Amino acid sequence: VLGSLCLYFWGTWWFLIIYLAYCTWWGGADAIWHECGHRTAFNSKKLNDFFYHIGSFMNSFEAVRFRWSHSLHHNYTASIDPHDFEVDGSIFWKPKKLINFLMIFIPGFGLLNLNKSIQKEILEHAFGIQTKVMKECIPDHKKSSCIFISRIYVFIWLIIIGSSILLNSFLPILMFLVPKFFATLNIVWRLTQHMGLQEDVKDHRLSTRSVRLNPIFSFIYWKMEYHIEHHMFPSIPSYNLPKLH
């Protein structure tokens, strides 16, 4: 619905408001990736894996890399060694300047900082470059799969860019390539999980945080605001986390 409204209001000021709502909903794929990655969204393993790959692409979370880095994240939450790449204290969670932190909440700012983006990592993997996360998280027998899927992502990106060129319109890029960069509300929700909490502790109550969200945000986020509960009992489906809380 939001996508159709974006098309209808393209070229008007209304597009900007609707597009930000569209991007926020698109960012909800973070929850799809996460829940299906734990294989708790559906009873069927095939359905979980199918939607895991869709959610992964929408988030630019390469599926193999994030399956292994997320496993490490649960086993060693906010750990320095082994390094928890999903709670990266030195780069993202504790910026040296307040202005650098505040700027990540500006819609589209990530497009100006691609050098530190997850998209750059996918490009590196697509070219067969072994990054720090590949060396430390991904088993040797899975590295070729990571490279292969990264190449699929890049190929789809090129198709989207080519479509924009052929149609002489930015719409394909705006609708399918860059929504993640404008989903700033999703950044706020994600930051609540571990930011400012203790590192290198085994007690999830000290390294993880649960918060309250309004019903709409909670629906988009798939109840992942109950994050302490999720880390303590990761096999419980997200829709049961409020009851567990």
Task: Describe each PLM feature range.
Residues 7-31, 50, 54-64, 179-183, ...:
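Membrane-embedded alpha-helical segments that form the functional core of polytopic membrane enzymes
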Residues 41-60, 82-98, 202-214:
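Juxtamembrane helix-capping/reentrant segments at transmembrane boundaries
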Residues 26-45, 66-78, 189-196, 220-238:
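Acidic (Asp/Glu-rich) catalytic motifs at the cytosolic membrane interface
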Residues 203-227, 231-245:
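Long, positively charged, glycine-interspersed low-complexity recognition regions
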Residues 53, 187, 243-244:
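Generic recognition of well-ordered alpha-helical segments
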Residues 23-36, 62, 66, 112-118, ...:
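Transmembrane alpha-helical segments that form the membrane-embedded catalytic/substrate-channel core
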Residues 1-24, 57-176, 238-245:
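Non-catalytic, topology-defining segments of multipass membrane proteins
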Residues 38-43, 130-134, 157-160, 213-218:
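Short hydrophobic/aromatic-rich motifs at helix boundaries and adjacent loops
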